[in-house]
Structure formats: C-alpha cells, structure tokens
From Swiss-Prot:
Cytoplasmic side: 1-47, 97-135, 213-351, 412-462
Gene name for this UniProt entry: Orco
Domain of life assignment: Eukaryota
Membrane topology note: Multi-pass membrane protein
Protein name: Odorant receptor coreceptor
UniProt function note: Odorant coreceptor which complexes with conventional odorant receptors (ORs) to form odorant-sensing units, providing sensitive and prolonged odorant signaling and calcium permeability. Orco is a universal and integral part of the functional odorant receptor, involved in the dendritic localization of other olfactory receptors. Expression of Orco alone leads to formation of rapid and transient ion channels not directly responding to odorants, but directly activated by intracellular cAMP or cGMP.
Subunit field text: Heterodimer with conventional odorant receptors (ORs). Complexes exist early in the endomembrane system in olfactory sensory neurons (OSNs), coupling these complexes to the conserved ciliary trafficking pathway.
Residues in the Extracellular compartment per record: 69-75, 157-191, 373-390, 484-486
Keyword field: Behavior, Cell membrane, Glycoprotein, Membrane, Olfaction, Receptor, Sensory transduction, Transducer, Transmembrane, Transmembrane helix
A GO CC annotation given for this chain: dendrite membrane
Keyword Magnesium: no
Keyword Membrane listed: yes
Localization (cell): Cell membrane
GO molecular function: calmodulin binding; coreceptor activity; intracellularly gated calcium channel activity; ionotropic olfactory receptor activity; odorant binding; olfactory receptor activity; protein homodimerization activity
Length: 486
C-alpha cells in the first residue's frame, strides 16, 4: 500500500524555493518532500533516472578505458568524464543526504517577526525572493542553452577519434558515430534505429545531467542569498533599534560625557547639552539636513511616553522603576525589540551552519573535480590552431566550468562580507544615546560578530573569491607541469 504525500501550506524557505523543489522532483532528483503524489512512485521515478544516468556514465568510462593509448584522445575523454562526474556525484549525494536538505529547508519554516520591524523584514524578504527567482531562471535558461549548443555542434566538423598506428607510431583519425558524446555501446550505434536511440538517449543524458547538477547548486546559492538578505535586514534595523531605545528612555544622559578626556590637565570644554541649557541657540541645519538624519521616522509614538502608574498621565515613572527610567511596558517594548534582533541573528547563524553541513562535502568534491578538469582544459587549449569545432568545444567547456566555480564563490564571498559588516553597523549606530541595556546589547553584538560567517568545503577550504583565485593559481601550476612533461 502506498502513501500519498499531499502538499500543505508552506512558509519560509520551502515556499520561496518551491519552483526549484518542483523542478528537482520532475527532473528525477530525490527531492520528494513538500510535493504531492505517491511516495513510492516518486522513488521509482527517481530510481529509473539514476539507472539511466549510471548506465550512460559507465559507457563513457568504458570508452575512456578503450581509447587510452592516444594522449589527446585520453585527455578529451577524461574531461568529458569529469564533467559528468559532477552530475552523478550530486544526484547520489542528494539521495543519500535527503534528511539534511529537508532539515535546512525547514529551519526557516515559521514566520517570526516584530511589529516595529515587520516592514523591513518584508522588504528584505521580497528582495531575497526576487534574487532567488532570478537566479533560478537564469541558470535554467543557461542550462537549456548549453545543452542545445552541445547538441548543435555535433553536426559540425568531422566525427572521428584519434588512435595510435603501431606501425608508424603516429596518431590517425578513425570515423565514429556522429553523437554528442564519445561513448561505447554494446550495439552498433553507427546507423539505423540504434543510432536514433543512442542519439536521443545522449540528448536526454546531457540535458538532465546538467539540470540535476545546476538545480542542486541553485538551491545552495539561494540559501546563501536568503541568509545575506537577512543580515541586511538586521543591519538595517540596528539604527532604529537604538533610536527606539533612546526615545523610550525617560533619562537622557549627556552623550558628550562619554567622550570626555580622562586627562586631569585637559582644558577642553564639553559640548553643551541643550536639555540642561535650553537657552543655547545652536543652528543644526548645517549638520543634519533631513529628518532621516535624526531618525525621526523611527521614533516611537508619543503615546509610549505617557505610560505610568497614574492612568498614563504622569511622567512615566512608577515606584520601583528600573535604573534606566523606563516603565514596565516601555521596558518590555525595548527588550522585545532587542530580543527579536538577537533571536533573528541566532536563527541566521543556525541556517548558515546547516547550509555548510548539508552541502560542504559536495562542494569539496566539486572543487577537486573542477581543478583537475580545468587543468586538462588549459592543456587542451594549447592545441587550438584556429576557429573551428575543436576551439568552440574547448572554450565552451572552459567557460562553463569556470562559471560553476565562480557561481559558488561569489555568493560565499558575499556571505562573508555581509556577516563581517554587522559589527560595523552595530558600532556605527547611535548606541551612546540608547539605554544601558541597549549599550550592553551592542557590546555583545560586536563581540559575537567579530568572526564572519562562512561556508566551508568539508572544513578544507572557505568558499570565497579567494578560493576562486586559488583554483586558478593551482590550474596554472599544474598546467605548467603538464607542458613540461609534454
């Protein structure tokens, strides 16, 4: 008896990434939760895709083993094998680590916001959603275009392979079936019905393999986009949070005293406090040019100042008021806002940690495979002697492989930049005008955010633009070794 997994009303990351999740399901990946249908039939559907992919990948490996004598042929077949290794690796990796993917998606499955910051939360969420959808659309469009170009270029140039002539000890061309991929088949794929079947099967293999690999990568990058926009949200509300604390605080200390010199011989005068010296007429128009500079749009309403023990008409103080001069309701308002910020930041930290645990090993395998593939491609690029099919093929492989690596690194680097700037945002806000609790909060934020968040490849490297530069450096080094061995 099969069970039916009916979709329900999802929120958070699951709802935002539903187009990606559905595409993963329909393409055959083992992403079975969050969508309707029979669980058994979905497993059968994915298993059939896996069998087809493994079968064709095995044929590619056999072809590489059978044509290992000629160096250029071996190099080209190795590049093709490494290219499709990404696809097989991520397909199987997702199948084995389904629970980790589901856990990461479910980390952000509830709506948790604060009424004072709901507008900012919604704005940055909409920005993240737009970026994730745009990334999904562009990557899928590029994938289909790449598969189409791969199929089209098959009909140009000579369909041959190079073999070693043992009599003359030289390489000679041998005609092979005109197929998108050089592959071994246990049947005669040179003409007739078997040729049509082989050609259609390879088109399916090229398209779906690239879709599988890129869908997994898009989900990973979408997680990073969401985390970065949440950090933007937290940085954006830091200043109004401090201004809220200052506006609710009935005791307004002289902020200039915070910067007083401790030297006993100092002759400097403190800045006059207009609250204690109302007669001072100081023109501030040259310093603050707009209400936004004062943060007026974030000030709490005046009714918040009238909370008190005498029907709200007093000065806001009650017996046993806290040292900051806040009433209980005012103190609750400030504390709830501070608590919201802390809990949201902890939520982002948990999300980033889950992303690294879920996709770190896949990143490690991808980078190892890409480094070897890019090295061989650089070697193959030295064989280009004109504008021909070979040149387009090598450049296409090279551009696609570099784009995949850069795709990871640019989003990983943005996560590092956004998380490292949280401490700067906390220090830059007007914390010295806030309550004592707010000042303590800023101090804790600065301490906790000294180390930037990052994604690691199974603890071996950090995903950033530095990694991209390191990969290019390693490729150049290995390329020089290959040239010398030539």
């Amino acid at each position: 008896m099969t069970t039916s997994m009916q979709p329900s009303k999802y929120t958070g990351l699951v709802a935002d990434l539903m187009p990606n999740i559905r595409a993963m399901k329909y393409s055959g990946l083992f992403m079975h939760n969050f969508t309707g249908g029979s669980a058994f039939m979905k497993k059968v559907y994915s298993s059939v895709h896996l069998v087809f992919l493994l079968m064709q990948f095995t044929f590619i490996l056999v072809n590489m083993a059978l044509n290992a004598e000629e160096v250029n042929e071996l190099s080209g077949n190795t590049i093709t094998t490494l290219f499709f290794t990404h696809c097989i690796t991520k397909f199987i990796y997702l199948a084995v680590n389904q629970k980790n993917f589901y856990r990461t998606l479910n980390i952000w499955n509830q709506v948790n916001t604060h009424p004072l910051f709901a507008e900012s939360d919604a704005r940055y969420h909409s920005i993240a959603l737009a970026k994730m959808r745009k990334l999904f659309f562009l990557v899928m469009l590029t994938t289909v275009a790449s598969a189409t170009a791969w199929t089209t270029i098959t009909f140009f140039g000579d369909s041959v392979k190079m073999v070693v002539d043992h009599e003359t000890n030289s390489s000679i061309p041998v005609e092979i079936p005109r197929l998108p991929i050089k592959s071994f088949y246990p049947w005669n794929a040179s003409h007739g019905m078997f040729y049509m079947i082989s050609f259609a099967f390879q088109i399916y293999y090229v398209l779906f393999s690239m879709i599988h690999s890129n869908l997994c990568d898009v989900m990973f990058c979408s997680w990073l986009i969401f985390a970065c926009e949440q950090l933007q949200h937290l940085k954006g509300i830091m200043k109004p949070l401090m201004e809220l604390s200052a506006s609710l605080d009935t005791y307004r200390p002289n902020s200039a005293a915070l910067f007083r010199s401790l030297s006993a011989n100092s002759k400097s005068e403190l800045i006059h406090n207009e609250e204690k010296d109302p007669g001072t007429d100081m023109d501030m128009s040259g310093i603050y040019s707009s209400k936004a500079d004062w943060g007026a749009q974030f000030r709490a309403p005046s009714t918040l100042q009238s909370f008190g023990g005498n029907g709200g008409g007093g000065n806001g103080l009650v017996n046993g008021a806290n040292p900051n001069g806040l009433t209980k309701k005012q103190e609750m308002m400030v504390r709830s806002a501070i608590k919201y910020w802390v809990e949201r930041h902890k939520h982002v930290v948990r999300l980033v940690a889950a992303i690294g645990d879920t996709y770190g090993a896949a990143l490690l395998l991808h980078m190892l495979t890409s480094t070897i593939k890019l090295t061989l491609l650089a070697y193959q690029a030295t064989k280009i002697n004109g504008v021909n099919v070979y040149a387009f093929t090598v450049v296409g492989y090279l551009g696609y492989a570099l784009a995949q690596v850069f795709h990871f690194c640019i989003f990983g680097n943005r996560l590092i930049e956004e998380s490292s700037s949280v401490m700067e945002a906390a220090y830059s806000c007007h914390w010295y005008d806030g309550s004592e609790e707010a000042k303590t909060f800023v101090q804790i934020v600065c301490q906790q955010c000294q180390k930037a968040m990052s994604i690691s490849g199974a603890k071996f490297f950090t995903v950033s633009l530095d990694l991209f530069a390191s990969v290019l450096g390693a490729v150049v080094t290995y390329f020089m070794v290959l040239v010398q061995l030539k």
